[in-house]
């Protein structure tokens, strides 16, 4: 995805993006759609840039170690029960550490924001903070 050959970049980026898309949706047929090369290259490069830089966290426990900074901020955590990209256990852990949080576990959803249960929960969460 970062090599000098545009053909190779496109091939690997499309494979990465198709794999991610196959995992993201609970109703996935098990193979990802075939995104455009430009979209796939941008998506895969951004995502892998974060992975390569460990999410720009200086240490693995940084989020947990800094929870005290946001404890008073109300939040709604929306999580798909069958999310294979960001496992539900991580949302449950953050929820336990964050007293001002509300965890909405969407029972029939994976990772994709486009899944109807996730979309509905995100809109509801946004509406709660509107005022």
Model-assigned labels for residue ranges:
Residues 68-72, 97-98:
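Short, conserved loop/helix-junction motifs that constitute active-site signature segments
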Residues 70-71, 77-79:
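Short beta-strand/loop motif that positions the catalytic acidic residue
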